From Swiss-Prot:
Reaction(s) catalysed by this chain's protein: tRNA(Arg) + L-arginine + ATP = L-arginyl-tRNA(Arg) + AMP + diphosphate
InterPro entries (alphabetical): aa-tRNA-synth_I_CS, Arg-tRNA-ligase, Arg-tRNA-synth_N, Arg-tRNA-synth_N_sf, ArgRS_core, DALR_anticod-bd, Rossmann-like_a/b/a_fold, tRNAsynth_Ia_anticodon-bd
Membership in a protein family: Belongs to the class-I aminoacyl-tRNA synthetase family.
Species of provenance: Vibrio parahaemolyticus serotype O3:K6 (strain RIMD 2210633)
PANTHER family per UniProt: ARGININE--TRNA LIGASE, CYTOPLASMIC, ARGINYL-TRNA SYNTHETASE
Protein name, UniProt field: Arginine--tRNA ligase
Record Pfam families: Arg_tRNA_synt_N, DALR_1, tRNA-synt_1d
Group of enzyme by EC: ligase
Lineage: Bacteria, Pseudomonadati, Pseudomonadota, Gammaproteobacteria, Vibrionales
Localization annotation: Cytoplasm
The enzyme's E.C. designation: 6.1.1.19
Main location: cytoplasm
Amino acid sequence: MNIQALINDKVSQALEAAGAPAGSPAAVRQSAKPQFGDYQANGVMGVAKKLGTNPREFAQKVLDVLDLDGIASKTEIAGPGFINIFLSEEFLAKQADAALADSRLGVAAEEAQTIVADYSAPNVAKEMHVGHLRSTIIGDAVVRTLEFLGHKVIRANHIGDWGTQFGMLIANLERVQQESGEVSMELADLEGFYRESKKLYDEDEEFAVKARNYVVKLQSGDEFCAEMWKKLVDVTMIQNQRNYDRLNVSLTRDDVMGESMYNDMLPKIVADLKAQGLAVEDDGAQVVFLEEFKNKDGEAMGVIVQKRDGGFLYTTTDIACAKYRYEELGADRVLYFIDSRQHQHLMQAWTIVRKAGYVPESVSLEHHAFGMMLGKDGKPFKTRAGGTVRLADLLDEAEVRAAQLIESKNPELDAEEKEKISKTVAMAAVKYSDLSKHRTTDYVFDWDNMLAFEGNTAPYMQYAYTRVASIFAKAGVAMDELQGDIQITDEKEKALIAKLLQFEEAVQSVAREGQPHIMCSYLFELAGQFSSFYEACPILVAEDEAVKQSRLKLAALTAKTIKQGLSLLGIETLERM
């Protein structure tokens, strides 16, 4: 149950009954401090101002008609007109019991929407690097959360699988095959192969002519070029899948929807934009001028959709892509997990999409932008030599460092278990370090911070789960075998339950805002509440069996909530660390 939404509805009804205009926001929020209750309604002051009445007097009118029977034990007016709401112990205990008995921990499924999520999007013929990490793991965490809430999510890995560079790659691939027979290569070879192809293109005019011809042939559907192009895509995606699997990212080859998918749509898009009078010829190119965007001279900015040589641009592809996602995939929402530097480009493409009538306003197009990963020097994260960090190398180093950490913490584990634990901790550390930061900010990549057992880190959260789960081994009872009802005998129990029952609010916030750090913050706070409860409220040596069973139930609900929350982030838990 979303208690915040429940109370918000109740306060909204009371506002209207007290004379507020229909639809006035109740603005119910979780209280910042326990002395202000569990929730606080902040909408009274805004309504009172509109009505020209005293906020505290109007707040009293709202309280007079506010029906929170069976939910709140106390309500009070605070400050200039806030309403503090204290949940009743009976309500909290009952809801906690219901959450523990529910495989979804009390989280209701939402009315299903079709949601397209565009994330990861590496380039063909190049290895994934650290710049792909944020889109990949942020997008995947939000996708998992949306699916948990019952939505139909279509993963769209918009890989860079088209462009003039494929002419030189195919020409070089043909040259190598003619010299040495069938080519079998890993993507690591392909990086060098790409550089070699570029060098030949720049220095050998005959090769450059052939490469340009192959671009035309590839675009025309030439069988040989199509076969070579497919080989390049296959080699790339095999390597990318290894990275996805290591990171426990849910993308597969079936989710690839590359730029090439939209090639056939591009001429029709430009023709239609011309027919609608949106695209006009300017210096031989087809351009859409947008009043919504101004150039440095204050004039409508021109967005090129077809070059003078007949070629199309990324904007044209993005227009076709949005159109396809609405018309063919039936999207209600389209989420783009793309670098913040691409914001204006996307906004221009979407403005054209709306003007052309390709996607109605009822469909939400959302840019879930993110900042950069920085080194300790505050500059973009690079190798010591100043090069781009390969994602596979980063994951390798994470595993080495995690193995050293586990060895120092628990040297008596056998080798196989150490390896399993260190790999799980390594991937969790890389992901959680990123996901716990606000998506839109740049953040500093720090190995020591990432692998610390203190603070809001993956090792801390994984250990928090292991610690709670170990209570049941000591008690000799399974989590699903507990008896009796949850009862509240201590303020720490009440505080823990209140935090546990905010899980649905955290899940829905991540889904709505595309901000996984909300879940990380919630889980970290939950772990802290459990520690306070554990220190104040003996479990295994509780004064009577009913209290022991109740506290074991709270431990079980905590363990299950942490496990489910981390799972939504794509992070695995461990029974032993």
